Amino acid sequence: MKPPKIHTLAFLVTGFPPDVSGVSHFNWERAHWFAKQGIYRVVVFAPDWQKEPTSSLGQLDSDTNLIIERYPSKPWVPYTLTHVPKFRAADLIRKKLAYYKPNLIVITDVERFFLLGAWQLPGRRYAREHHIPYIAEYHTDLYNFSASYPGWQWLRNAARSSQLAGYLYRQIDMTICASDAASQSCKELGIANTRTIPFLGIDVCTYSPHRRNRKWLETWLNNKEIDNKVLLFLGRLGFEKRVDLLIKAFARLRQKRSDCSLILAGDGPTEVVNQLKRLAESIPNVHFTGFLLGETKANVLASCDVFCSPSPYETFGRTVVEAMASGIPVVTVDSGAVSEYLLEGVNGYLAPPDDVEGLANVIHKVLLSNNTEIICRALRDANQFSLDQGCQNLSDYYQQLLGISETRKDLTSLSRK
């Protein structure tokens, strides 16, 4: 039997291990998924800011179809925890592309590659000269959440007034959005060539209510708190995540009941973390843990009582789905992509955005409710956001572009059943 033709995929990313953001996790998991399919060779171009990974997430395995090329990078001025390509990285990427001869190029984080980064779109010229697809993925609602950062207003205003986003994305054949909310954000920026494909997902097998055990929380809870109701936020501690809103809502909640604790699991820019700690210092039972990864993260998720995410600008909501798969009720805000799949009173709870009192009231309602049916529905619904399904959706689309498959599947949205 004739072996299948191997197609080479080139992924140009700024988020990749050892960075521990949700985007980095997905880029890593996606690269491995495609490399294991037997019909792709995967080449990832990622920042070189820390070559030796500090967690198992970044450890290479024996996957011969996965190649990781590191390009020269620097901290991105608007958000220095993110690393972006230096100007000279574009030439290195061009030479490597000529060597690997990809059949398709995918660039994520387009704005970060261009603005205050390489000042160009690496791979575009190669794609044009060799007549191959040049695809973008819209992972981060950068323009909306930049409103949360006082120092970013110039970037947001400049991008809108100059129509920079529309100009950049017109250089690309198609922009893939994971949700209708992300697609709408693109359209508001003048990005017309979009397609909605639910490509993001989690490893649902990692998360389970069977992990629930209060011992996993003993590191942070004192003896008086061990029987408390524990609220959890897990993710990046950035202004755009509106953790300040949650801290204020928790203070209001404690006026109604004192038997509750708040765990804030994550990290972020020093100035943001310090500001949040100052906000919380007079409120009892608030605990900052730093980033949690792997088994520890999954165990803590299942062992808390309510997951709270007040972020209004999610293009997917990775930690929300992880919490759903862990068997704890989710409270989030009625905004962004999360409200496309999390339905009030069906598989979770929605609070009004930017409303401290409203968020506190919803959390209080959850603590008073029997959430068994909601948790069961959330567990079922989380399965539709598996990593396998998301990557398969992408693979189906790639195969259309590569001419492998003539079958056209409806990947534009997930049905609400």
Residue locations for each model-derived region?
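N-terminal subdomain of nucleotide-sugar transferases
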Residues: 1-57, 64-70, 410, 415-417
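Short hydrophobic beta-strand element within catalytic cores of glycosyltransferases
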Residues: 329-332
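Conserved acidic donor-binding segment of nucleotide-sugar-dependent glycosyltransferases
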Residues: 344-345, 349-356, 364-370
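Nucleotide-activated donor-binding/catalytic signature segment of Leloir-type glycosyltransferases, i.e.
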Residues: 274-292
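A short helix/loop element that forms part of the nucleotide-sugar donor recognition site in Leloir-type
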Residues: 92, 208-224, 400-403, 407
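Aromatic "clamp/platform" in nucleotide-sugar-dependent glycosyltransferases that forms part
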Residues: 312
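Conserved donor-binding/catalytic core segment of Leloir-type glycosyltransferases
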Residues: 12, 218-250
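Donor nucleotide-sugar binding/catalytic pocket of nucleotide-sugar-dependent glycosyltransferases
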Residues: 157-216, 226
